[in-house]
């Protein structure tokens, strides 16, 4: 057997010079050893565990039985504490931690456990459901913490090695490795900004909010979801790109409670095979402009209905989701070059990068005994329209959130519903809606618009 190994080695070594390549045999165990330990040692102190607790009211299951309720009544709700766990990443030595929005959603108390086992309570500085990201600040400390540097996620290539760090199943900090399986995954349906890094590094429940790093120890993504039939890792995990995370951090560091992103002021639609054929495209690619709001950045730059957006700052746009990501990650204050196809020719547009106007939002939560009790509503400003992906010139009052257990959520109202009338009263401002829902009536007739379709709702008082 030894002679066969020697012969095989000889054949390999003898072949190498014929190719003109120099091959050197490893001369020590150190040269053979491949280890990610130096990278892990550098980044692990910046990866934390996030524990969230929320108080919810619930009844004993027996009270769901109508016969039981008939004799004993509805029963008083009991307060219960629900707990969730996830991961986070320290991105600022002052104690700013990035995690997923879904990890801390509706949390009444948040604790962060460091790699050295110390625990700190944390406040929510910013939360952004659109990107499924949130920023926390460690409380009552002037300490400087180990923080991780952000990398350029757009520089990632399929096949690059990456490491995933987090707290799967609450067992403690865990490191897994894999490769970038795909970039620019846009049809996942996890967040409004559907643009993800796909990796086969093992990601499990509890890893949400953890770090995806390259071999330089730079943060290239925040782990957020897995595709699984079993609930555990099956080699298909998704991370929010670091370039999206960068804007969220910048907003938090600037003192904003919401993410400040560039506003386009145009409505884009997907390219279907039929539209692609009508435009003489070889394949469905790009995003079609179906409307431009007056006085918006898009209008000022000369964008027109019918333009086909094909790139942003030289980066190709395959679909609407790709455009949303590319444009949203551009820094405010400058400009972006957007290339469009118009009548078969490429036209270069310079779009100013500014936030949408947000005056007169007048947001409030509806109370009382109407079917809209528990709905948070706002006047539709360009900023609100941009947040909810409505047409920029939409007017009226829109549902921006729904309280868990509120009447509005229970009867089926949804975030993004535009309330047009209540009992024949036209609703133009939130004050109109507040006044209309204070009335005591037996029948509620509400007209709303959802997804461009008008819906008439009739409910008992």
What are these regions (language model features)?
Residues 17-27, 34-38, 87-89, 101, ...:
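C-terminal recognition in membrane/secretory proteostasis and scaffolding
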């Amino acid at each position: 057997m030894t002679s066969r190994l020697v012969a095989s080695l000889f054949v390999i070594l003898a072949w190498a010079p014929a190719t003109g390549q120099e091959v050197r045999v490893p001369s020590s165990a150190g040269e053979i050893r491949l280890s990610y330990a130096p990278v892990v040692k550098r980044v692990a102190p910046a990866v934390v565990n996030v524990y969230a607790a929320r108080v919810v009211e619930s009844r004993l299951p027996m009270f769901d039985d109508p016969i039981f309720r008939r004799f004993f009544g509805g029963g008083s709700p009991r307060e219960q504490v629900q707990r969730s766990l996830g991961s986070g990443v320290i991105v600022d030595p002052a104690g700013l931690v990035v995690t997923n929005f879904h990890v801390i959603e509706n949390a009444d108390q948040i604790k962060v456990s460091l790699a050295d086992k110390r625990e700190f309570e944390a406040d929510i500085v910013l939360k952004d459901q659109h990107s499924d990201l949130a920023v926390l600040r460690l409380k009552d400390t002037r300490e400087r913490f180990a923080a991780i540097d952000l990398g350029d996620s757009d520089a990632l290539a399929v096949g690059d090695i990456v490491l995933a760090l987090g707290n799967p199943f609450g067992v403690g900090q865990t490191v897994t490795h894999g490769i970038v399986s795909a970039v620019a995954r846009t049809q996942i349906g996890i967040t409004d900004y559907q643009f993800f890094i796909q990796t086969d590094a093992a990601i499990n429940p509890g890893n949400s909010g953890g770090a995806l790093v390259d071999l330089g120890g730079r943060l290239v993504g925040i782990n957020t979801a897995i595709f699984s039939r079993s609930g555990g890792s099956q080699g298909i995990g998704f991370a929010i790109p670091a370039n999206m995370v960068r804007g969220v951090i910048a907003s938090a560091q600037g003192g904003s409670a919401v993410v400040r992103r560039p506003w386009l002021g145009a409505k884009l639609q997907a390219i279907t095979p039929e539209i692609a054929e009508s435009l003489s495209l070889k394949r469905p690619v790009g995003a079609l402009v179906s409307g431009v709001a007056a006085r918006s950045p898009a209008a000022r730059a000369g964008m027109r209905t019918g333009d086909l957006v094909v790139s942003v700052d030289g980066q190709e746009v395959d679909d609407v989701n790709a455009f949303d990501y590319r444009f949203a990650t551009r820094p405010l204050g400058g400009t972006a070059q957007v290339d469009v196809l118009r009548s078969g020719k490429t036209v270069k547009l310079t779009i100013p990068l500014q936030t949408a106007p947000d005056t007169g939002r007048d947001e409030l939560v509806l109370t009382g005994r109407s079917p809209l009790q528990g709905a948070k509503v706002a006047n539709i400003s360009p900023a609100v329209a941009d947040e909810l992906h409505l047409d920029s010139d939409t007017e009226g009052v829109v549902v921006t959130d729904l309280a868990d257990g509120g009447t509005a959520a229970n009867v089926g109202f949804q975030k993004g519903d535009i309330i047009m009338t209540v009992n024949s009263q036209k609703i133009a401002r939130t004050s109109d809606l507040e006044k209309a829902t204070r009335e005591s009536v037996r029948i509620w007739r509400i007209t709303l618009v959802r997804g461009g379709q008008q819906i008439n709702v009739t409910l008992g008082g």
